[in-house]
Amino acid sequence: METMPNWLMQRAFLTPDRTAIEIEEEKVTFMQLHEKVVSVCEHLTHVGVKRGQKVAVLMKNGMEMITVIHALSYVGAVAVLLNTRLSREELLWQMDDAEVICLVTDQDFDAKDIPVYSFAEVMNGPKEEASIQEEFSLEEAMTIIYTSGTTGKPKGVILTYGNHWASAVGSSLNLGLRDDDCWLACMPMFHVGGLSLLMKNIMYGMRILLVPKYDADFIHKALQTRGVTIISVVSKMLTDLLERLGAETYPSSLRCMLLGGGPAPKPILETCVEKGIPVYQTYGMTETSSQICTLSADYMLTKVGSAGKPLFQCRLRIEKDGVVVPAFTEGEIVVKGPNVTGGYFNREDATRETIQNGWLHTGDLGYLDEEGFLYVLDRRSDLIISGGENIYPAQIEEVLLSHPAVAEAGVVGMTDDKWGQVPAAFVVKSGEVTEEEIIHFCEEKLAKYKVPKKACFLEELPRNASKKLLRRELRQLVEEM
């Protein structure tokens, strides 16, 4: 069993006085961060958190969440990171599925039969000496993050210490490291993209400028004045920043904008080239511990729409009906690497279906060009990407079908200037119901970003001979609106 020194403890030993985290007016060194984490460990130990247990974390970006995530790794517990934008019903389902022993949160939450510990109350309570892991086994689970499958049923992706380590190493081999690097972190840490920055922070010894909540004005100013060298963004954020930048440009010290959540439109990339802003487009998912492919800034205009090539220790191919296909042939994107999950929690069926001989079948469609650059054609075919959040129509359809006046339901993405896409619903009625009532019904059961922005009524939904819903025809109806 391969082990490594506890990452934060080792970093605090190697560079104790180096700045680890900046948040608002607070600066914390790696040694100070380690000391904070030990204190959280002792409080969590008092409330009964032990090695091997799964603990749900429902917190917003901030020093408190950072210390909780590290503290759980210190005691050997698995952090189940919950999306703060989900509804109570969705969160309860995930906690039950993950078999968590308690919830640590910074907000009011009634978790029924699961003990809920307010971070503030825990830290004001008694301490107990903690048994701290001085080494991590790379094979052990560190986190579980839920991702929706093509059926809409969430699956808990198990990411090991080895997965997180490989992801950080792959990123460093791709982007390089500098002594003056500072990564501006504005992505939620309950997403793997945001979480991966915490791993890089302690592994690289790199300063993180943490933004608790997305604030385009603050981020724009920080890029100009705070010595930021790298930032992770999605297309909407990039558009927001360019609007604020106007005729100016950012300092040359900004060496990378890492763009996820789908490719950027060519006009935006052209503007970035004119202003000397290096945009690295990426492709990844929870199952790959963040990015697995990156298109470097060298190719941002010559390979428009491409997600680039795999990270150094990763492999990628395109398969159709189980056969590897040549360049320019569309098929399923299949990936392999030490950053790829070994499977889903308590979902052996989904694990067997998705991971075969170490290769992860993403369900995404794409092709490779003659030079091996990846082009993603469809994100898991029916996926709606809204402001960087993944939305699966099947989950919304399940909610719609639970309404007594709904006989059939179909959901597709509708183009939106602000969010990229938003859900649009098509409904066949079995009783009297209005569009407003449908939307209000969804608001009570779904996260806000998953609620359909439009509900249209049809006599029947388009289906093929096998009665399978023809979403492409629904998309055509949306385009004709």
UniProtKB/Swiss-Prot annotation:
<dbReference type="GO" id="GO:0005524">
    <property type="term" value="F:ATP binding"/>
</dbReference>
<keyword id="KW-0067">ATP-binding</keyword>
<dbReference type="GO" id="GO:0009234">
    <property type="term" value="P:menaquinone biosynthetic process"/>
</dbReference>
<dbReference type="InterPro" id="IPR045851">
    <property type="entry name" value="AMP-bd_C_sf"/>
</dbReference>
<dbReference type="InterPro" id="IPR010192">
    <property type="entry name" value="MenE"/>
</dbReference>
<dbReference type="GO" id="GO:0008756">
    <property type="term" value="F:o-succinylbenzoate-CoA ligase activity"/>
</dbReference>
<comment type="pathway">
    <text>Quinol/quinone metabolism; 1,4-dihydroxy-2-naphthoate biosynthesis; 1,4-dihydroxy-2-naphthoate from chorismate: step 5/7.</text>
</comment>
<keyword id="KW-0474">Menaquinone biosynthesis</keyword>
<comment type="function">
    <text>Converts 2-succinylbenzoate (OSB) to 2-succinylbenzoyl-CoA (OSB-CoA).</text>
</comment>
<protein>
    <recommendedName>
        <fullName>2-succinylbenzoate--CoA ligase</fullName>
        <ecNumber>6.2.1.26</ecNumber>
    </recommendedName>
</protein>
<keyword id="KW-0436">Ligase</keyword>
<dbReference type="GO" id="GO:0031956">
    <property type="term" value="F:medium-chain fatty acid-CoA ligase activity"/>
</dbReference>
<dbReference type="InterPro" id="IPR025110">
    <property type="entry name" value="AMP-bd_C"/>
</dbReference>
<dbReference type="Pfam" id="PF13193">
    <property type="entry name" value="AMP-binding_C"/>
</dbReference>
<dbReference type="InterPro" id="IPR042099">
    <property type="entry name" value="ANL_N_sf"/>
</dbReference>
<dbReference type="InterPro" id="IPR020845">
    <property type="entry name" value="AMP-binding_CS"/>
</dbReference>
<comment type="pathway">
    <text>Quinol/quinone metabolism; menaquinone biosynthesis.</text>
</comment>
<dbReference type="Pfam" id="PF00501">
    <property type="entry name" value="AMP-binding"/>
</dbReference>
<keyword id="KW-0547">Nucleotide-binding</keyword>
<dbReference type="GO" id="GO:0006631">
    <property type="term" value="P:fatty acid metabolic process"/>
</dbReference>
<dbReference type="InterPro" id="IPR000873">
    <property type="entry name" value="AMP-dep_synth/lig_dom"/>
</dbReference>
<comment type="similarity">
    <text>Belongs to the ATP-dependent AMP-binding enzyme family. MenE subfamily.</text>
</comment>
